């Protein structure tokens, strides 16, 4: 019954969010330490592929989320050469986390459905079941204008297909992507 009520609540929140004025299209994910393309000097060219958050030889990436239940990337590339890799999640919207909160949770692709189901009842722990062994890493739940980071060991991604998603109820169907281990 709790899951049913949670799903109804998520649907109501999703419908309310969808009725909002659409935001501008999301910019590409920016590696940490670099200015977004819109802030870069005119002489610098923006990367051509906005579909992935590249590791680009460094050990950090930034993923943006918004009030339209979107991440600005569908692929986070993690370099095998890194001892640690940090992903910063930025919520570029304005709505509070109670109505349009986002997190970024990494798990094996085959485990993600279970992570979602167990997360629905875990509002007090940012919609992530406490001590869930299936979760490689996750950020805290954030609202508009906030950010949160996670740090992981890339070696944990060596044995399988991994995904990232927002586990706020109703968001995972739209807010998800692949985590790719690269050379």
UniProtKB/Swiss-Prot annotation:
Q: Which UniProt keywords apply?
A: Cell outer membrane, Copper, Electron transport, Lipoprotein, Membrane, Metal-binding, Palmitate, Signal, Transport
Q: Where does the signal sequence lie?
A: 1-17
Gene source species = Neisseria gonorrhoeae
Pfam families associated with the record: Copper-bind (PF00127)
Q: Where's it found, cell-wise? A: Cell outer membrane
Q: Which GO terms describe its cellular component?
A: cell outer membrane
UniProt name for this protein: Outer membrane protein H.8
Please list the GO terms describing molecular function.
copper ion binding; electron transfer activity
């Amino acid at each position: 019954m709790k899951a049913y009520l949670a799903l109804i609540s998520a649907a109501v929140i999703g419908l309310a969010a969808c009725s909002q004025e659409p935001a501008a299209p999301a910019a590409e994910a920016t590696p940490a330490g670099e200015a977004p393309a819109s802030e870069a000097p005119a002489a610098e060219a923006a990367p051509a592929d906005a579909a992935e958050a590249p590791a680009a030889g460094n050990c950090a990436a930034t993923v943006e989320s918004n009030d339209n239940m979107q991440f600005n990337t569908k692929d986070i590339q993690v370099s095998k050469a890194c001892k640690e890799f940090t992903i910063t999640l930025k919520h570029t919207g304005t709505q509070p986390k109670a109505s349009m909160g986002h997190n970024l949770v990494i798990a094996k692709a085959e485990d993600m459905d279970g992570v979602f189901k167990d997360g629905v009842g875990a509002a007090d722990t940012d919609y992530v079941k406490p001590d869930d062994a299936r979760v490689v890493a996750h950020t805290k739940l954030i609202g508009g204008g906030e950010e949160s980071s996670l740090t992981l060991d890339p070696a944990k991604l060596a044995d399988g297909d991994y995904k990232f998603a927002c586990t706020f109820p109703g968001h995972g169907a739209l807010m998800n992507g692949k985590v790719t281990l690269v050379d």
